A protein has these predicted regions:
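Interfacial/gating helices of multi-pass transporter permease domains
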Residues: 41-61, 127-132, 192-195, 234-241, ...
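Small-residue-rich hydrophobic transmembrane alpha-helices
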Residues: 50-110, 147-166, 273-337, 370-392
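Signature of the first transmembrane helix
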Residues: 14-75, 79, 243-263
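Short alpha-helical transmembrane segments in multi-pass integral membrane proteins
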Residues: 1-20, 78-143, 187-242, 299-366, ...
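Transmembrane helical elements of multi-pass membrane transporters/channels
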Residues: 18-34, 139, 150, 173, ...
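Short runs within selected transmembrane alpha-helices of multi-pass transporters and secretion channels
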Residues: 71, 139-158, 166-174, 195-208, ...
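Hydrophobic transmembrane alpha-helices of multi-pass small-molecule transporters
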Residues: 62-65, 109, 177-182, 207-211, ...
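Helix-terminus/linker motif at the lipid-water interface of multi-pass membrane proteins
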Residues: 32-51, 120-127, 183-190, 250-279, ...
């Protein structure tokens, strides 16, 4: 039997650290097969193919970010009911979230597949990479149900305090993805489409195995027929939280789309540099994202248990870990950015290497801003204030749009490099007072309940 874990008692730092580690390893593995995708495509198919895969990165983030946000949102009521030990309602939430996932993922897959070509044209994708970008993006969209369930099941399991089980299945998915990448690209010669097929298929296999394992091993999830029925009241709660979290990712991605569209207009070398730099950056951001995800579960459970003071302890502990990590990462990327870029492109591609290095040097200088963003945003989401988290995404969107419209045409690629850091700062300026407001309100709620 798999075990769940309560985070409502004990020192915050070791609890969060130990919960973060499996999430971190999982996110690193996820980024590893993203790196492998790009490395195999770049090394064996050339920089045009690498640019094809990267030309739609922000669009993929827009669509899949919405799906992943919904999945994370669906896990919040589960974590809250688990923290409150209301296991019957918790099981009902799990059942309804799975039912909603079926409908939502199929509808999104159909809609995005139909408009795939139009999306790439809107992105000003260069003609010489359009065909490869279309093949890659279409397969990714068709595979959205696999991605949706892949993330939803992880969110549910994490809500129960178990961050290890999703990691084990992610190991399987990563190994399978790498093998299929090599087979589809080198043996079958399917090019960019083969890279997408490998990713979607490996996620589908992992999602299926997670589902089987979850219901066989977690006794706490085995519900009665009544608990497994669709309940509109619970569905409204899930959609209210999930859609708002999904929109937060999508709103953020709109700014990213504008930024990438502006970058696409700068030519293939800039697209290839942006692609390789983003893959490297996302790899090094995994600990910050994992720390934020841990805080969502930590804050959700302690909110459900009526212990807001532990949420503040969690903020302090996670911020300390974030500062240490970002300092180390700054040294690594300032010294080794070009070496990491060589994973994707040949040494002869001097322009691409230099632009990749420039992007990484600027980004890593602002990692503490992103670290604070992750901690505060996920904490606010964990206690159910998803509207505020969504508004922070609006701040990011506005910053990226302003950079795209005014700075990139005037200053070129270096302005693209500053797009994300400006967005992180804008979000922090909103999130810091937002968290103070939420925390004070939670404390008042506890005091009111105690008096009553």
């Amino acid at each position: 039997m798999a075990t769940s874990k309560e985070m409502t008692a004990g020192p915050a730092l070791p609890l969060i650290f130990n919960f973060t580690l499996p999430l971190l390893f999982g996110n690193l593995l996820q980024q590893t097969y993203s790196l492998v995708d790009a490395a195999i495509v770049g090394k064996f198919l050339g920089i045009n193919a690498l640019a094809s895969v990267g030309a739609s990165t922000s669009v993929v983030f827009l669509i899949l970010g919405f799906c992943n946000g919904c999945c994370g949102g669906f896990g919040i009521p589960v974590a809250q009911k688990f923290g409150a030990r209301d296991y019957s309602t918790m099981r009902s939430y799990v059942s309804v979230s799975l039912q909603l996932a079926v409908v939502m993922s199929v509808v999104i897959a159909i809609f995005t597949s139909i408009y795939c070509a139009d999306i790439l044209k809107m992105m000003r994708t260069p003609e010489n990479i359009f065909e490869g970008a279309y093949a890659y993006l279409l397969v990714t969209f068709i595979g959205i149900p696999c991605t949706f369930f892949y993330n939803l099941l992880s969110s549910i399991i994490r809500a129960l305090g178990d961050s290890k089980t999703p990691f084990y299945f992610l190991v399987l998915a990563t190994v399978l993805n790498i093998i299929l990448d090599l087979f589809c690209i080198l043996v079958l010669g399917w090019g960019e489409m083969g890279a997408a097929i490998a990713t979607v298929f490996s996620q589908g296999v992992s999602a299926f195995l997670r589902y089987v394992y979850m219901y066989r091993k977690f006794d706490i999830l085995r519900g009665t027929p009544k608990e497994r029925k669709y309940q509109s009241k619970l569905a409204k709660t899930l959609l209210s939280i999930g859609v708002r979290m999904g929109l937060q990712f999508s709103i953020t991605a709109i700014g990213s789309i504008m930024l990438q569209s502006a970058n696409n207009a700068l030519g293939t070398a800039c697209v290839a540099a942006f692609t390789s730099a983003m893959r490297i950056k996302m790899f090094f951001l995994c600990p910050l994202e994992s720390l934020g995800m841990a805080m969502a579960t930590f804050s959700g459970q302690n909110y459900g248990a009526g212990k807001p003071e532990r949420i503040w302890s969690g903020i302090k502990a996670s911020t300390l870990m974030m500062v240490i990590y970002t300092a180390v990462t700054f040294l690594i990327l300032m010294l080794g950015a070009k070496s990491f870029a060589l994973i994707f492109v040949d040494p002869s591609e001097i322009e691409v290497l230099e632009k990749t290095e420039l992007f990484l040097h600027i980004s890593v200088s602002f990692f503490p801003m992103l670290g604070l963003l992750c901690i505060l945003r996920y904490t606010i989401q964990g206690v159910g204030y998803t509207n505020l988290a969504m508004f922070s995404g609006v701040s990011e969107m506005i910053a990226r749009i302003l950079v795209s419209i005014y700075a990139v045409p005037a200053f070129g690629f270096i302005a693209v490099c500053y797009g994300d850091p400006m967005a992180w700062i804008a979000a922090d300026l909103f999130l810091i007072p937002a968290f103070i407001y939420v925390y004070r309100r939670l404390k008042r709620q506890v005091l009111t309940s105690a008096v009553a």
